[in-house]
């Protein structure tokens, strides 16, 4: 090891410090219910989460079959905004669609 090369301990602690600098991420989850149409869920996934029609359809089927599905991972503020947007749009259309966020 040369005098200018950092020790393993220095390199490791440097990597840990960088990782700790990232904000925590949150998964936004949509939950299945007996009233919200599959078409509306696909529309939400496209408009709110920027999914393609194909990807939105796959996520919607997961929600339908498994009871819930992950729409994406975001920082806390972005996840909160997306959850609130889903609830607002669902209520406007008379659907009880539920969206939550889970810390990763």
UniProtKB/Swiss-Prot annotation:
GO aspect biological process, one term: protein catabolic process
Domain of life: Bacteria
Xref: InterPro entries: ClpS, ClpS_core, Ribosomal_bL12_C/ClpS-like
UniProt-listed SUPFAM superfamilies: ClpS-like
PANTHER family: ATP-DEPENDENT CLP PROTEASE ADAPTER PROTEIN CLPS (PTHR33473:SF19), ATP-DEPENDENT CLP PROTEASE ADAPTER PROTEIN CLPS1, CHLOROPLASTIC (PTHR33473)
Family indicated by similarity: Belongs to the ClpS family.
UniProt subunit comment: Binds to the N-terminal domain of the chaperone ClpA.
Function: Involved in the modulation of the specificity of the ClpAP-mediated ATP-dependent protein degradation.
Name under which the protein is recorded: ATP-dependent Clp protease adapter protein ClpS
């Amino acid at each position: 090891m040369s005098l200018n090369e950092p020790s393993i301990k220095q390199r490791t602690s440097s990597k840990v410090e960088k990782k700790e600098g990232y904000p925590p991420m949150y998964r936004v989850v949509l939950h299945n219910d007996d009233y919200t149409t599959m078409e509306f869920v696909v529309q939400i996934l496209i408009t709110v989460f920027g999914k393609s029609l194909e990807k939105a359809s796959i996520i919607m089927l997961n929600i339908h079959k498994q009871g819930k599905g992950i729409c994406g991972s975001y920082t806390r503020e972005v996840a909160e905004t997306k959850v609130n947007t889903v609830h607002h749009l669902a209520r406007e259309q008379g659907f009880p669609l539920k969206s939550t966020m889970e810390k990763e």
